[in-house]
Amino acid sequence: MISRWLLLIGLLALALFSQPCATEKAEPQINSTPFDHEPFFMSYFEDSDTILMLTTQRNLFRSFDGGKGWERVDDMDGKMKQHVVSVLQHPSDKDKAYALGSKGRHWITTDRAKTWNAFTIHQSPAIQHEPLVFHGWDSGKVIFQTDECIGTFCIVKSYYTTDDFKTVSPLRVSAGGCAWAVGHPQFAEGLNLEDQIRNRVLCVVSGLKVPAPYANRLVYSDDFFSNEADGAEMNLHQGRPVSGVQTTAAVKKFLVAAVKSQGTDEMALYVTLDTKVWHRADFGGHRVEQDAYTVLESTNYSMQVDVLTDQSSMTGVLFTSNSNGTYFTRNVEHTNRDRFGHVDFEKIADIQGIVLVNTVSNWKKLESDHRKKIVSEVSFDDGRTFQPLTVGDKHLHLHSVTTYANTGRVFSSPAPGVVMGVGNKGDHLKEYSECDLYVSDDAGVTWRHALDGPFKYEFGDQGAIIMAVSDKGKIGEIKYSTDHGKEWHTAKLQHEIFPKMLTTTPDSTSMKFVLVGSKESTGDGFFVYSIDFGSLHGRKCEKDDFEKWPARLNEDGEPDCLMGHKQFFNRRKANADCFMDEEFKDPQPIFEPCKCTAEDYECDYNFVRSEDGKSCLPAAPLVPPAGKCREKTDKFYGPSGWRLIPGNNCIREGGENLDKDIERTCEDTNGSPETHMSHKQVFDNSKQFSGQYFYLERQASSSGNDETVLMLTREREFWVSHDHGKKWEQPLKGVQIVAIIPHPYYSDGAFLLTGGQEAFWTVDRAYTFKSFKVPIPPTRDDMPVFSFHPQYKDWLIWTGAVDCGHGDCHSDAYITKNRGKDWDLLLRYVGKCEFESRKNRPDSENLIFCEQYANENKNNHKQLLSSDSFFADSHVHFDNEARYATMSEYIIVASHDPNNANSLIASVSVDGKTFAEAKFPPNVDVPVKTAFTVLDSSTHAVFLHLTMGVLKGAEYGSIIKSNSNGTLYTVSLNAASRDDRGFVDYEKMQGLEGVAVANVISNVDTVLKKGAAAKKVKTKITHNDGGQWMLLPPPAKDAEGKDFGCSNKDGKASDKCSLHLHGYTERWDSRDTFSSGSAIGLMMGVGNVGDHLTSKEEADTFMTRDGGITWKPIKKGRYIWEYGDSGSVIVIVPESRPTKILHYSLDEGDSWENFKFSDVDMLIHRLSTLPSDTSKNFLLWGKEQDSNQLATVNVDFSSLREASCKLVEDGQDSDDYYLWEPKHPLQEDNCLFGHIEQYHRKKLAANCWNNWREPHVHSIGKNCTCTRADYECDYNYEPQSDGSCALVPGLPKPDASIVCKEDPDKIEYPELLLGYRRIPQTTCMGGWEPPVVFKPCPGKEKEYKKKHSISGIGLFFAIVTPIAMASAAGYYVYTRWDGKFGQIRLGEDIGGREAILSRDSPLVAVPIAIIAGVVAVLKALPLLAISLWRSSSSFIRTRRDRAYSRPYASRGSFAARRGDYTSVVDDEDELLGVEDGEAEGEEEEL
């Protein structure tokens, strides 16, 4: 008995004394490593203890033991030290990582950082684009990208490797970067497309003609752009290419392309599963705007996208797509976002269907209260429904992505069901510092308090270990839990730190953690801690320590089904006293199938959800089976609209079968065409047509299909129609509106003025209007009241009247950045003020130009000022300015000549900082320059009309054209006609480069003697941007088949017989143009055939289909016209005479049909349609003959045809389209500006609609050799009657040797340069060029002679060797040739050895040519010395020209041959003059 007591006492003593040892062993092992510089990147290689860490000193470190030991990484050459700027790990290959260097040297590891191999690309990795783009199937394929950006314009150079950078090849230059079609391992999975898309690359490249983002194209190549340099365009929209592609993104099995058009903020998202078939994503009428959407973490069967809804409050709407990414359903309103696009959204890791989001509960009050009240919600059914987070009976709210204080995922990890977050109980989320740590071990169903205060946290050992560190100041300990956060233990750190980062392995299976912190809050000195819980020596979990845990529960607490199955995990019980101890082995889910329910189905293609979500409705009329639907009351069996979600594995037997065919009525199908094509509305209270109507053009990337028209009557009543005039409404009834001002850069917006300080705006296409106050009444001066910012739609400058009742009436300018909510005074005593921000002007976002009277006194002269600080300070450009105009990329200023107060000086700036005086051609003799008109300047040159004659009714001048910077001018066309207001009969053809029509006074001398009544006007056309002008060729017969009063045998124009058209100055409305930007090649006009233009009463209507080369009559008399559906329908109506009939053509004017649009005759004042001419609706404005009341008639042609034309974008014709090439009438080929363009034109017989919102160049076919048409006369030279350029009479020949003085190293100079310069747009190579004779620079005769001479021995061999070789070959052939010279042999077959010596053999033909050439060589000997150096210099020059002319390689794609190629837009004329006048349309008289 005593011995038993002794044994018991001994055991107790042993346990007592051994307890401290056991406690000591229970502590985690903690090691620290000091660093001088902050670690800012840390990442594990998956399924390993290997970590990469990058410090701010650009040193890369690695650890192979979970952070316990560190070593700096270097390559064999020792060049990695302090040169690594970023590190990226391969997303799908766990062995690979990439270190990108700062000096063109980069590194790759393929063995988890053990070894590093260098590769060289002599450029820095891209910053604004992804530097590395990975292939989803083959980890050896990577695209490396660099970028150079000026503002929003970037040049991206891409390189590619297919063998882990053992070899690197250039891919191409682009505007938005390149990506693999297979961007994710799940893309095209199971579609058997491996051979087709394995090497496919997609690139966002510049437009063929405009290097602006709205013209970007998405092209692809399957051979790395080796065979076809530009690639093929991707057909994104209904089988057609789309302009404005911004970027692409790989999202699981989806590939997404984002598109944005000019003139709208709205973006279109196009989605594909195979790169072949693309669909536009439908967000149920919700707008997706640029920089206002975020593609979130998505599933294998749907995408999650959050769309910004309120810029000021930063809230959004969460959408979830169907399985093909085309139709999106709204899940959550008012999601919380930040200004970087981050969204408070996270899917619980490895568990299907559970989502945590934060929303803003006080979103309605955010305009007055900027403090968001954020609440947290959770969904257990993939976002269909949401519920609050709860701690007991209290609501819990957690900080999420927008305020996350650690790396990696916010709430969850692969540890099944264990979720944590920092937050608080209550009605909304508090500041981070006021929150506590909470934990859930049932995937968010229930929560409990874990620790007081905010913490960083991580999960280990599949959730068996949770580690946390306080995030509230300096710490000296860590917290950890082994029971899902119920109880917490503490471990001390060796050094106190401010924690920066806590991390562990990505799969959360390890028991090792890494903590990074700084010694001080300022970041001076750093420690990296390795914390290993493996030292706790707990037992390994066994079978009884696990539970079968259901991942999701329904409202009844039962396991819930999602995608046709229930999901379970074998999970360690929270109170189990064991560790998993299975490093790098991920928890495996267990699935149990369910019977199919409605939740397992989605709407099929071409079906959309009903508003209640219970059925799928046809998105387009159904096509019934053959023989069905003879009557509307018939029925047929057709698709239900449902389909089983792809990837859903529910059990159909015993479940719902929603996708079986159902009985449908024939009312759901295509019906018979509508016969009621016209809709008339008479406005009872309107007696006069004011002419004020405006369309809100819908851009290609805009959703919806309304065609909105705004109209103002003479009685100041404002009307709106959203269906192109079929129905009208008065949204501001009773309010008198004096002006409608559409936003020039944002086609969904407009402003309405009342004449006082109340005004209205709309930004949603006139569906809603908001009132606002302008700071002062509108200006009384002749200038615009509004100026709009090109990039920021809410930035406005208002110019208003001040002190007009006190004798000092003047204008002040105010600015707003929030669409009139707040105004700030900009400048007093102003003239015109404008934003001058342009994409081609770096750092011009805040640049504003203003005219201001000196010393704020209107009696003083005007100054032109600029400021980029909203006039906190400013710069005076001109002290005595008359007016200024902004045209495309140029700012053109007219200032008073200090030597002649009645004369003007023109100055030009491209950058808005430096101005240069315009040098007018010396052959334009205008001693007193009283006025000049700025014409269209969209082709990188300024066109000016310089007034020379001001005789009333016979005003004229010279059209002069500048070089690319707008400073040096040459005469393009003399005696161009203008009117007394300064407007010019000049119009550029839309859609085609370099084509313009102008009217000239052909008998100026007679007019000066006899007066304006004697003037004769002729019409001329240019096809090379003003380089050459010619008369319009006359048609042979009139519209009735009769002869004209004159004719030409060859059909060409002559001085006695040509076609003449009434031009710009005779139009009622400046918007009525000859041509259309979408109806490529078409022009219409009213005029006559003869030796000059006659009155309008004698005019007929003519048309061209080939850009003005040939013309045909279409109707006798004057008609007004409009184009529709990109030219596939043309409507004309008689001008100024009563009618009830209009005429229309569906074949580009070959035939015409009549349509009766009214039962009574009407006098039509205007015929209008969308400015893009892409609508099938037309609107007639006028009045009934016996009434003075305004009436409108809508005519809708859409019912005439049903199908859309089918396009084949492979360079071939299709059934509906052919490729059309513009041409020059003086050239045999189709070269214009040095290249051949190809456009898709609808075949005349094709019975379909274009339905294409934007004109599209198919390709630039090829570059051409240069001809005379690629050159124009240089400064001081003028064109001659034979087309040559000659020095202006009386001017001395330019001293070409001045180049020798400017460059002392020059050896020679061009002694004779015949006055030509290349047209800026041309891309031609080689061919014709002006002859140049070079002479030696003074004192460089010896060098010149040495450069161009040939040595005696060289000359000898150059002559003798070819003759000797030719003679020997000739003798050999002569002795063996079957024919001999002069012999003819008939009927003999030639074969074997003799065939080599037959007459057709190259061996015979070539020596004979050489022998024949001997005589020529001998005759050419005297010229040999001259020709040798000339040919070599010509070769060098040609090579140089080719280098700089190479098209479409970088910035401008179409015009990369010029370094100053910039974004351009078409602008109307602006007149610069001394006298004030009345502005009309969009032109401005200065």
Swiss-Prot record:
Subcellular compartments: Golgi apparatus, trans-Golgi network membrane; Prevacuolar compartment membrane
Keywords (alphabetical) are:
Glycoprotein, Golgi apparatus, Membrane, Protein transport, Receptor, Repeat, Signal, Transmembrane, Transmembrane helix, Transport
Where would I find glycosylation on this chain? N300, N324, N965, N1263
Where are the Lumenal topological domains?
24-1349, 1427-1486
- Listed GO CC annotations: cytosol; Golgi apparatus; membrane
Membrane-topology annotation of the record: Multi-pass membrane protein
Gene Ontology terms describing biological process: Golgi to endosome transport; Golgi to vacuole transport; protein targeting to vacuole
The family database entries (Pfam families) matched by this protein are listed as: Sortilin-Vps10 (PF15902), Sortilin_C (PF15901)
The residues forming the signal peptide are 1-23
BNR repeat residue intervals: 61-71, 378-387, 438-448, 480-489, 719-729, 1102-1112, 1144-1153
Q: Which SUPFAM superfamilies match?
A: Oligoxyloglucan reducing end-specific cellobiohydrolase
Residues assigned to the Cytoplasmic compartment are 1371-1405
Keyword Ligase annotated: no
Entries under InterPro entries matching the protein: Sortilin_C, Sortilin_N, VPS10, VPS10-sortilin, WD40/YVTN_repeat-like_dom_sf
Give the transmembrane ranges.
Answer: 1350-1370, 1406-1426
Does ATP-binding show up as a keyword for this record?
no
Q: Which domain of life is it from?
A: Eukaryota
* Cross-referenced PANTHER family: SORTILIN RELATED (PTHR12106), SORTILIN-RELATED RECEPTOR (PTHR12106:SF27)
**Record function comment:** Functions as a sorting receptor in the Golgi compartment required for the intracellular sorting and delivery of soluble vacuolar proteins, like carboxypeptidase Y (CPY) and proteinase A. Executes multiple rounds of sorting by cycling between the late Golgi and a prevacuolar endosome-like compartment.
Q: Which family does this protein fall into?
A: Belongs to the VPS10-related sortilin family.
Record protein name field:
Vacuolar protein sorting/targeting protein 10
Native organism: Aspergillus clavatus (strain ATCC 1007 / CBS 513.65 / DSM 816 / NCTC 3887 / NRRL 1 / QM 1276 / 107)
Q: Which gene encodes it?
A: vps10
